[in-house]
Amino acid sequence: MEPLFPASTPSWNASSPGAASGGGDNRTLVGPAPSAGARAVLVPVLYLLVCAAGLGGNTLVIYVVLRFAKMKTVTNIYILNLAVADVLYMLGLPFLATQNAASFWPFGPVLCRLVMTLDGVNQFTSVFCLTVMSVDRYLAVVHPLSSARWRRPRVAKLASAAAWVLSLCMSLPLLVFADVQEGGTCNASWPEPVGLWGAVFIIYTAVLGFFAPLLVICLCYLLIVVKVRAAGVRVGCVRRRSERKVTRMVLVVVLVFAGCWLPFFTVNIVNLAVALPQEPASAGLYFFVVILSYANSCANPVLYGFLSDNFRQSFQKVLCLRKGSGAKDADATEPRPDRIRQQQEATPPAHRAAANGLMQTSKL
């Protein structure tokens, strides 16, 4: 099985085993023979269900951020870009479902290249947005006053734009090499040596598109926990409740993100060292880890929306579940730039250092 992006299908080398390590001819890598029965129907149905859930949840996030003026905070700008990336990421699933149902790619080489490139761009953008959000959370919690000059909507927009541009640059190999194979599937057609190019690509995407961002995320939240624990000792029970909320958010964000993507990259990396057997179980494993990686986009509206009181109230307003004016002011950890300046002017210098350690952090 060749390591690939989720938008492609699991592939086995049609030539000798030597081709997997760079030797042999450059014969087409084709998908596994379609399995009769439940899987041929179940996999496309699962793809479409994940697509519907992801599109619905992330579209709702986009709408409430754009609809309510008070939702346009720095953090929500990152959440908006994450939701846009997830929506575009979900749009590739109907094509993937069709290919798996029909056992070939019926949309032509141009759309194959476009879908795989967009899939790569939005995968990277989602990870980078999550990383930038974690850095922003670190600044908001650990340095709430001194970071005010950097935590502005303009800076957030520039950082988000940089994430999109960087993602496009990192996805250029897919734009260049994605094509319809002889077997009729949409895949990456690497030049000689095929095995070396494939191995370099999967290591490149795993390190820069998963493990390095995850390391940054873990470091940011570790520093947040250290800061909250240190502050919690001084401010008593209320602060300890905030500490528990931050810790819970850390666990949810890191574990769900890692849990959804780690199996996919693990399967691909293991396959570099030990070729997975050409049997239905391997194809089933691959389909499972691909669906799990897409399911992370369904979880994002829950992680970054429903755990926020402001998002929850906005969702209820939009869905007509309650009466009200929509979102309240920004989260307590998300003071608007003008409020930060007013705080700094009104707060005596002797108390500003204490404010850095005691600012409310219960709503992330």
From Swiss-Prot:
Carbohydrate attachment residues: N13, N26, N187
Cytoplasmic side: 67-76, 136-157, 223-247, 309-364
Basic and acidic residues composition bias: residue spans: 327-342
UniProt keywords, alphabetically: Cell membrane, Disulfide bond, G-protein coupled receptor, Glycoprotein, Lipoprotein, Membrane, Palmitate, Phosphoprotein, Receptor, Transducer, Transmembrane, Transmembrane helix
Transmembrane intervals: 39-66, 77-101, 114-135, 158-178, 198-222, 248-273, 284-308
Record GO cellular component, one term: neuron projection
Membrane topology, as annotated: Multi-pass membrane protein
Residue ranges, annotated region (Disordered): 1-20, 327-364
Cysteines engaged in disulfide bonds, as pairs: C112-C186
Tissue: Adult pituitary gland, heart, small intestine, adrenal gland, cerebellum and fetal hypothalamus. No expression in fetal or adult kidney, liver, pancreas, uterus, spleen, lung, thyroid or ovary.
GO-annotated molecular function: neuropeptide binding; somatostatin receptor activity
Source species, domain of life: Eukaryota
Main location: membrane
Family per record: Belongs to the G-protein coupled receptor 1 family.
Quaternary structure (record): Heterodimer with SSTR2. Heterodimerization with SSTR2 increases cell growth inhibition activity of SSTR2.
Function: Receptor for somatostatin 28 and to a lesser extent for somatostatin-14. The activity of this receptor is mediated by G proteins which inhibit adenylyl cyclase. Increases cell growth inhibition activity of SSTR2 following heterodimerization.
Protein name: Somatostatin receptor type 5
Source organism (scientific name): Homo sapiens (Human)
Native organism taxonomy: Eukaryota, Metazoa, Chordata, Craniata, Vertebrata
